[in-house]
Design a protein with these regions (language model features):
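Active-site/catalytic core of tyrosine-dependent DNA strand-transfer enzymes
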Residues: 172, 193-241
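Short basic/aromatic active-site micro-motif
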Residues: 47, 79, 225, 242-260, ...
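Short, polar N-cap/turn motifs at the start of nucleic acid-interacting alpha helices
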Residues: 159-166, 262-282, 307-310
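C-terminal secondary-structure termini that scaffold catalytic or DNA-interacting sites
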Residues: 164, 175-198, 202, 218-219, ...
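Catalytic-site neighborhood detector that most strongly recognizes the C-terminal catalytic loop/helix
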Residues: 173, 271-296
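C-terminal catalytic core of tyrosine-transesterase DNA break-rejoin enzymes
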Residues: 93, 140, 144-151, 227, ...
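Basic, Lys/Arg- and aromatic-enriched nucleic-acid-binding interface segment
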Residues: 70-74, 78-80, 93, 97-99, ...
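N-terminal core-binding DNA-recognition domain of tyrosine recombinases/integrases
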Residues: 8-21, 32-114, 128-129, 203, ...
């Protein structure tokens, strides 16, 4: 049995039934585009730690399998490594291997996220550009709440409580092939500012019959993550801040919250982190030992109120 044959077996037998649909799709992408082209034809019983190490080092240096191409980022490398280990661990339980050849490779783990924190001027330019392009409600919501892309595109109007100014995030809802899929009931609730509520009410008036908060105007289906990235790329190009990634909206929201006195437990709940220690590890290195209030930031402002105050609209 080759590694390719076992991976296909593992996907159908285990991964498809144990992972979320979006996670399963992401795993399939990694296997197809990274692991199988290099290691797929090797007999499973002949796979060695040296082969795995050479493969991972090659992906680190040449991400697209050929010299001259740019290497893979640290997060992608760790994801590939973990996935291969997970698959081979099951091969041991299935009695096909006695040890995991992927475990000998040690890839340095980063202790913090790599974040480009937006300045007040960059936030204002970003929101100005989003408004000119017609994308303001979606990206104002993203910047003021730190929502992940997948959470943003899966929102429904029934998640919004206008009276209490809150939004309930269905953490087990996802967009798969442009359709909403729900596979659990875990939720978290976050507060919204009056400015964001007003924007969302006006957005609802544009398509009141749709259950989706944000949808593609031509297909009336949810946006895909790729579409959100393209819209974000349009915004940063229009604003002239090309170094800002979508994930930096989330990082900016988190850092501003901490600077304004939100504790890590509360921030972890808002961001959907499993443990506050993850939040602390990710973001506290970006702050002074004793957090001082930025002179540009009103002391009484929450992270959402701060960002909204930068760009008041009628």
């Amino acid at each position: 049995m080759t590694l390719r044959e076992y991976i296909l077996f593992w996907q159908e037998t285990y991964d498809k039934h144990q992972s979320r649909p979006t996670t399963y799709a992401a795993h399939n992408y990694v296997f197809k585009n990274h692991i199988l082209p290099s290691l797929g034809d090797i007999p499973l019983s002949e796979l060695t730690s040296e082969m795995v190490g050479d493969f991972l080092e090659g992906r680190r240096r040449f991400g697209n399998h050929r010299p001259g191409s740019s290497g893979l980022g640290e997060e992608t490398m760790r994801h590939i490594h973990r996935l291969l280990q997970q698959c081979l661990d099951q091969a041991i339980r299935d009695g096909l291997l006695t040890e995991n050849p992927a475990k000998a490779f040690r890839y340095r783990k980063s202790t913090t996220v790599k974040a480009n924190i937006m300045t007040p001027l960059e936030m204002e330019d970003y929101l100005d550009a989003a408004e000119r392009l017609g994308y303001l409600p979606m990206f104002m919501l993203a910047l003021t709440t730190g929502l992940r892309q997948g959470e943003l595109i899966a929102l429904k109007w029934s998640d919004l409580d206008i009276e209490n100014r809150t939004l309930t995030i269905a953490e087990n809802r996802a967009v798969v092939r442009r359709e909403l899929v729900e596979y659990g009931s875990q939720t978290r609730t976050i507060a919204l500012t009056p400015e964001v509520i007003d924007l969302l009410i006006r957005e609802h008036d544009k398509h009141p019959s749709s259950p989706l908060m944000f949808m593609h105007p031509a297909t009336l289906k949810p946006y895909s993550p790729q579409m959100v990235r393209r819209m974000h790329d349009e915004i940063i190009k229009e604003a002239g801040i090309d170094h800002i990634r979508y994930v930096d909206l989330r990082h900016t929201c988190a850092i501003l919250a901490l600077k304004n006195g939100v504790d890590t437990k509360e921030l972890a709940q808002m961001l959907g982190h499993y443990r506050p220690t993850i939040t602390r590890q990710n973001y506290e290195p970006y702050l002074p030992h004793k957090v001082q209030k930025d002179e540009d930031i009103p002391n009484e402002a929450t992270q959402s109120e701060l960002i909204c105050s930068l760009h008041e609209r009628q």
